[in-house]
């Protein structure tokens, strides 16, 4: 991927589409690979095993190839993915009731991994939460040195009824 419209989250979305199709749950950890832009790359882990990386190519590396646009790359070990694949389709009842989405932005220290925040949300025991995703990470003067704002989307639903605001607050 490349260009002004491409970003880390678009690339991550492509990878997550593959993981969803294979019934795999990925965890993303900050990558230290030297050819990836610091803070814009992630190692991909599934089942405690690193199966690849994704992220923005470091601008110095792109410049070595006379490329002046942002470049994004991913490498995944397909043999490892297929070995981890749970196989078989998993079916569950669709809810007849509308899901409720909530967005939340949290200012955290730069060293807090967004993937760890998603894992904490998913393991929180929130009764009706069906997904937690990071959709933006902002760094800037308004946030402060050594800090970042992580924006997350949470989806809540029930197969038996419409949820109230109190149930998802």
Which positions does each model-derived feature cover?
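A carboxyl-terminal module marker
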Residues: 2-169
């Amino acid at each position: 991927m490349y260009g002004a419209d491409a970003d880390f989250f678009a690339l991550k979305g492509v990878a997550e589409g593959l993981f969803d199709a294979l019934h795999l749950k990925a965890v993303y950890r900050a990558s230290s690979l030297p050819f990836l832009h610091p803070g814009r790359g992630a190692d991909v882990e599934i089942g405690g095993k690193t199966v690849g990386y994704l992220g923005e190519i470091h601008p110095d590396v792109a410049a070595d190839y006379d490329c002046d646009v942002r470049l994004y790359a991913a490498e995944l070990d397909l043999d490892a993915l297929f070995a981890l694949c749970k196989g078989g389709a998993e079916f569950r009842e669709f809810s007849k009731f509308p899901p409720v989405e909530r967005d939340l932005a949290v200012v955290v220290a730069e060293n807090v991994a967004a993937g760890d925040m998603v894992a904490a949300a998913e393991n929180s025991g929130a009764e009706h939460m069906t997904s937690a995703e990071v959709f933006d990470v902002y760094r800037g003067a308004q946030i402060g040195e050594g800090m970042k704002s992580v924006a997350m989307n949470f989806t809540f639903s029930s197969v038996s009824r419409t949820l109230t605001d109190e149930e998802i607050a």
